[in-house]
Curated annotation (Swiss-Prot):
InterPro entries: Lysozyme-like_dom_sf, MltF, Solute-binding_3/MltF_N, Transglyc_AS, Transglycosylase_SLT_dom_1. One of its GO terms (cellular component) is cell outer membrane. NCBIfam families: PRK10859.1 (NF008112). This is Membrane-bound lytic murein transglycosylase F. It comes from Haemophilus influenzae (strain PittEE). GO terms for molecular function: peptidoglycan lytic transglycosylase activity. The active site is at residue 312.
Amino acid sequence: MKGLFLRIITALALLFWAIDMVFPWQFLRHTEENHYAAIQSRGALYVGTINNQISYFTNNDGERGFEYELAKAFADSLGVELEMKTFDNQEQLFDELDKHNIDLAAAHILYHPKNAERFQIGPAYHSASWQLAYRKNENRPKNLGNVKKDIYISNNLALEETLKELQKQYPQLTWKRNQTLTQEELLLQLAEGKIPYVIANSIDIAAMQQIKPELAIAFDITDEANVHWYLPNKSYHDLQTALLNFMNNAEETGLLDNLKEKYLGHISQFDYVDTRSYMNAIENTLPQYSPLFEKYQGELDWRLLAAVAYQESHWDPHATSPTGVRGIMMLTKNTAQHMKISDRTNPEQSIKAGSEYLHWLISQLPESIEKEEKIWFALVAYNIGLGHLIDARRLTQNLGGNPDNWLDVKKNLPLLAEKRYYSQLKYGYARGYEAYQYVENIRRYMNSIVNYHRVQENQIINDNASNESAVKNLEEIKENKD
């Protein structure tokens, strides 16, 4: 009997050892001391986020988004892979964080004392506020006391705590917390007139306005608050230290500024009339030309090429300017000859030539400029000429900036129109402020196309899922009757 007992103990020990070799993190992940070690052991960082046009989304180019790129850089700094896990709302994120199913939550989450008590928080990297959104052309409430209809919020208990505090000042204040729809889906319902008000993150509202100009902001519900990543309450200090060092480095190297420029820089500019006209053109005009943009995109994103064409001509193949540039890409005679096309008003010829010219401009730029940023420099050259771009880079260097960094060069473009600067430059005066706005508009137009199609695809997926669910319910009802 004793021998049998020893054999059982030995067998169990070997079994646990084998499991530990294959799945060591299953034992490590739940302890404070070993959270960091668990990440290293499994070779992957699990990051929870929310699928929207700022934090995280996927398209034909793969995974994208502010939080994705920042999390990818953090995972790289740890020497592990990144695995993004998407959820519908903040409470789902936090539940998974509580269960240690994710290592951190990253979704532009605003600071709230309730969350800080429940979790560890990383360094602040941005700020935002809660705002009341309503539908344009409806009555705009001046404060919460004027709100007479339902207010909708996504599943966010911290926001609900804020509203409970405000309810002391506005006793009639009521709201509906939707536990199934995302904040973005609530804003879409608001834009379509299905619900009267939504309280949402100011970043998400500004982003949605770029494709749903019907959305308007009534007022801020709260002051601006810091945005943080959140970690499980019991996270070993090695992970917290690694995150702190990473965020400090991201600030110093310009990574954070570059990501803010890429994903947030364009959303602060909003013009209702321009955006409404543009969305109408995306729906009704772009489908005529998108096959040509895709055909001649080359190394570019076809949606960027389309955005350039809209900025140039509003997708009018017969557009003509007082200076003589013509066609959907608004080419000069010299450029048309250089690109060997005969008819600038022919959409296919114009798009082909415009794309080839942009590729040529990119090829003229030094290798010291990062590949992803070259297009913005090339667009300046497309607008005001390569010589003036060279001047802008030289001026940036003279002023102590980095001539290879788009953010540094961008802020100095308006100086090309000031005599004290252009008088010292080789190519002289240029309307650099127009080039600055030119690139900003194109970035905004491109992102709007990307997100318009993303929202359309999501709605199709949701509609199909609803239809499948309805069919399943009908089948179950039929079976029950039978």
